[in-house]
Amino acid sequence: MGPRRLPWARPGPALGLLLLALAGAVPAAGGSCSLLEEGNTIQKLHEDCFCYVQNRTMHLQYIWSTVQVKINSTRTFRFVPTPEKSNCRNSETVFEFAACAVQILWRPETSTETFLKIKQYGEDFCFRIQPFKEELYTVSMTREMLDGKLLFLFAAGIFLFHFANSLSRSTNFFYLSGIILGVLALLVFVLLALKRFIPRRSTFWILLSGCWMSSLYLIYCFKENMQWLWSEHRIYVLGYFVAVGTLSFATCYQHGPLTSELSITLFTWTLQLTAFVFIYCGVNIPQVAYAIIAVKPSPKGLGYPPAAAWHIGRKMKNHFQSKKVVVRCLTEEEYREQGETETVRALEELRSFCKNPDFSSWLAVSKLQSPHRFAGFVLGSPHVSPAETKAHDEEYGIGSSFLEEQLFETRTESEQDETTSYIHEGDDENEDEIHEPISFPYATELL
């Protein structure tokens, strides 16, 4: 078996390196460093330093992208972050200082393969590779345009903040949160379970702060060595998850869900703060994360993303969906107007076609009964003669025989309907008279 990555770093050199890095007293070894660029691969035999210069221009297409540096070799090498390029001395917040200290202290001293994810739009990142022997090692940098982890964290943060009030009142989510807290932060879970046995509140808050710091450190250690632990000690990891998860569920079930409004409110605020952490960790550009976190607490800001998504979805649906043809019946007036318009348009098209030089006029004239009338139509005369117009008015106009026949038929049908209804009413009355019982007023006297 070849050399593998050592899971734990030796505390002596790492602690010394941490102290020097925090003090900023270690100068850069050597002269210029090799610059890392996206998509490039560098192969070296001897000790060398490498730097990644951050791009100061922000691009929104990189909001969920990550830059990953991979260092691999057939033999072990030492990975040393360049102290003056580290962020510890110039940390702006306590969280950045603690993260930098943990990163320098926890980084394994020797390994055969190392993966680094560089935070973009921050400080320039430099490190040094020290091989124990002259063996070829490779340093490559790649960019993943859409990191699924970042997108999942961002979506989870938005969902958790938006439904924090509803989730804090859910019994199932309470048990699920207890299991997750017990697995990831066992010390915090145990302290919360034993809260009733701690008399002073100040002591409880001091212990809670220490447990949270220890839990965050253990979470970071597990994250950095998760691949190695899963490949080498999978059974122990699964056993820990099952045992601690079951114990956490039993403790939450014994305690019962939250009932007081104060506890539910505190749980809601905790979920919202966790959502802010997810949003910040799920966005690669800090300025964008700050803007989203600033907009989310406002009541009006809660309605903007759903409204914008609904508006964009409606526009896309109208754009891609084929328009349905609406069919309706024409009124009598619309039918007459449309008929006159289409007739005039068709006659003009016929005149234009007959005036075309390609039209075989002699062949058409030979088949017509009145060529003189056809020539007049082509030159602009009406297609109907005055005699034909008069005959049409007499046949279908006001006072025509056709209209009289229509009116007579309508009147006859209405009279027949009235007669039929009268006959039915008479029959009903006769039936009522037949079925009506006959009374004998003198029946008593006859008896």
Swiss-Prot record:
One cellular component term from this protein's GO annotations in UniProt: nuclear envelope
Coiled-coil regions, chain positions: none
Bilayer topology annotation: Multi-pass membrane protein
Species of provenance: Gallus gallus (Chicken)
Gene: NEMP2
Entry keywords, A to Z: Membrane, Nucleus, Signal, Transmembrane, Transmembrane helix
Chief location category: nucleus
UniProt record similarity statement: Belongs to the NEMP family.
Signal peptide: 1-28
Membrane-crossing segments per the record: 144-164, 173-193, 202-222, 235-255, 275-295
Protein name: Nuclear envelope integral membrane protein 2
Cell compartment(s), UniProt: Nucleus inner membrane
Family matches, as Pfam families: NEMP
Region feature Disordered, mapped onto this chain: 410-438
